């Protein structure tokens, strides 16, 4: 699996990625798990170390809006965010590839001991949600049904 990914624990306050321009990507099992983007995000977390985090993933950084809303509604929860910027956009990929990508990311998030996962990607929610819900022993939520309410 080649390419860059954006993986971050989400912390309270402003996170200026420009300040990381000269940083080197961290490697996890010889894969790069985050990349530098010249953007500014306002992301929120109340660091509660007594509970497992909620994992959130998207095909890029758009899921940070979902993460922000989770933190607004559940201020005592921790969040681990994974943005798959290496393979964005998902809309042009096959269903089998979307399911494969989702499985890989869920396995990674499980290594971070998350207690639930939110698939913040519409494409992955539509194509992979039912499959991964059956395969993994962790609550997995998509964004299509909650967004339609």
What does each of the following model-derived ranges do?
Residues 41-149:
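Non-catalytic structural scaffold of enzyme domains
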Residues 5-7, 11, 15, 28, ...:
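Aromatic (phenylalanine/tyrosine) cluster motif
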Residues 33-34:
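Tryptophan (W) side chains
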Residues 5-6, 37, 48:
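Generic extreme N-terminus detector
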């Amino acid at each position: 699996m080649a390419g860059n990914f954006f993986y971050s624990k989400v912390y309270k306050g402003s996170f200026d990625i420009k300040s990381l321009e000269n940083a080197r990507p961290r490697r996890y099992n010889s894969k790069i798990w985050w990349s530098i983007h010249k953007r500014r995000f306002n992301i929120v977390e109340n660091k509660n170390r007594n509970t497992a985090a909620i994992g959130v993933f998207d095909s890029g950084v758009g899921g940070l809006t979902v993460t922000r809303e989770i933190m607004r509604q559940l201020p005592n929860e921790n969040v681990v965010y994974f943005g798959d910027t290496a393979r964005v956009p998902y809309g042009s990929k096959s269903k089998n590839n979307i399911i494969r990508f989702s499985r890989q990311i869920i396995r990674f998030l499980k290594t971070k001991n998350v207690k639930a996962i939110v698939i913040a990607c519409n494409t992955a929610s539509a194509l992979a949600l039912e499959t991964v819900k059956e395969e993994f022993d962790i609550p997995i939520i998509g964004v299509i049904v909650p967004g339609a309410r």
